[in-house]
């Protein structure tokens, strides 16, 4: 089991729930835009958010951002440890450094002293896109990713700094898995999971679900980020669904059949219409295209419909309640979901 750290108001590691992260894609110095995006991410279920800090203005903007948001802010630092120090002084709750480009040992030691004084955690995050050549020459890429991060961790420890999170991300699923398995055998710091440069929506969803899901099932990982080339809110939604699928989160879900020639209703349209409402109400709702297997397959759902020639059969926990016309399916389901009651009206 990993150690437990406290990042602002979030407990990370140990027996605590897996924490969902994302990263803004706004210019951090554009404070109002960044605040809006962070609040959108928080509304979607994000619990910690990372912001890029490429310059002094971005580092100093963290102070203003912190005044308007209610989740921990992580400052993403490359190359310049002085920006990390400035971000800490501006109120960052956690720092991410890249061992591939942060520089010589004295810089890490200097950063560790300031982070220790301010009680701020550091994530050492290695990345396949910025591995040092000497590590690549000594090891296979997965081991190089892991050893690169572990070396930086050892420098922090020498400075008496143990408020550490560690990560190793590749754009390759297998490399990501192997690197994190390696790390989990060496240290007990909380591990942040993700696949870097995972791509656009579909590709990222597949890669992230496999790598993150596999590692979490093995008991590896304390916080996750799904990386998507696009709207970061989608990252949070997918992360939630990964955790829900692994029974690490409990929230509502729509189960729906893949449809075939027996389908009598527009399964996809109905499912999409009610999905957001279902998730908020912590129910399982089944939308099945026909009655052949629909009631049996959706029998464990709190509420469900199965299409018929003239409409749909409404069932609850596998028991048929009544039939409803096609044009009333969404209306009836919505009423039941909102009321969370067996009253049919």
Curated annotation (Swiss-Prot):
The keyword Phosphoprotein does not apply. Pathway: Isoprenoid biosynthesis; isopentenyl diphosphate biosynthesis via DXP pathway; isopentenyl diphosphate from 1-deoxy-D-xylulose 5-phosphate: step 5/6. Keywords: 4Fe-4S, Iron, Iron-sulfur, Isoprene biosynthesis, Metal-binding, Oxidoreductase. Pfam families: GcpE. GO terms for molecular function: 4 iron, 4 sulfur cluster binding; 4-hydroxy-3-methylbut-2-en-1-yl diphosphate synthase activity (ferredoxin); 4-hydroxy-3-methylbut-2-enyl-diphosphate synthase activity (flavodoxin); iron ion binding. It is an enzyme of class 1 (oxidoreductase). Its cofactor is [4Fe-4S] cluster. Converts 2C-methyl-D-erythritol 2,4-cyclodiphosphate (ME-2,4cPP) into 1-hydroxy-2-methyl-2-(E)-butenyl 4-diphosphate. This is 4-hydroxy-3-methylbut-2-en-1-yl diphosphate synthase (flavodoxin).
């Amino acid at each position: 089991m990993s150690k437990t750290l406290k990042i602002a108001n979030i407990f990370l590691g140990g027996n605590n729930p897996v924490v969902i992260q994302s990263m803004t894609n706004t210019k951090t110095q554009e404070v109002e835009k960044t605040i809006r995006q962070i609040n959108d991410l928080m509304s979607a279920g994000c619990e910690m958010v990372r912001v890029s800090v490429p310059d002094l203005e971005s580092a100093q903007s963290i102070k203003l951002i912190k005044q308007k948001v209610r989740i921990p802010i992580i400052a993403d630092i490359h190359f310049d440890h002085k920006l990390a120090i400035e971000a800490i002084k501006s109120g960052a709750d956690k720092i991410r450094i890249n061992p591939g480009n942060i520089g010589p040992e004295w810089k890490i030691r200097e950063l560790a002293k300031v982070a220790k004084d301010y009680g701020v955690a550091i994530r050492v995050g290695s990345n396949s896109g910025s591995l040092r050549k000497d590590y690549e020459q000594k090891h296979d890429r997965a081991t190089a990713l892991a050893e690169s991060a572990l070396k930086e961790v050892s420098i922090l420890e020498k400075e008496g700094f143990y408020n550490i999170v560690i990560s190793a991300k590749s754009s390759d699923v297998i490399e990501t898995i192997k690197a994190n398995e390696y790390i989990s055998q060496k240290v007990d710091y909380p591990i942040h999971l993700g696949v870097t440069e995972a791509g656009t929506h579909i590709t990222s969803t597949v890669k992230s679900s496999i790598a993150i899901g596999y590692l979490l099932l093995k008991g590896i990982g304390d916080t996750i980020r799904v990386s998507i080339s696009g709207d970061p809110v989608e990252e949070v939604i997918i992360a939630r669904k990964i955790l829900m699928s692994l029974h690490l989160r409990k929230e509502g879900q729509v189960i729906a059949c893949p449809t075939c020639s027996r389908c009598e209703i527009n399964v996809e349209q109905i499912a999409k219409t009610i999905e957001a409402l279902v998730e908020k109400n912590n129910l399982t709702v089944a939308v099945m295209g026909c009655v052949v297997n629909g009631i049996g397959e959706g029998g464990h759902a709190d509420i469900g419909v199965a299409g018929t020639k003239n409409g749909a059969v409404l069932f609850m926990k596998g028991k048929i309640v009544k039939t409803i016309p096609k044009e009333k399916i969404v209306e009836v389901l919505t009423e039941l979901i909102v009321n969370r009651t067996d009253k049919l009206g």
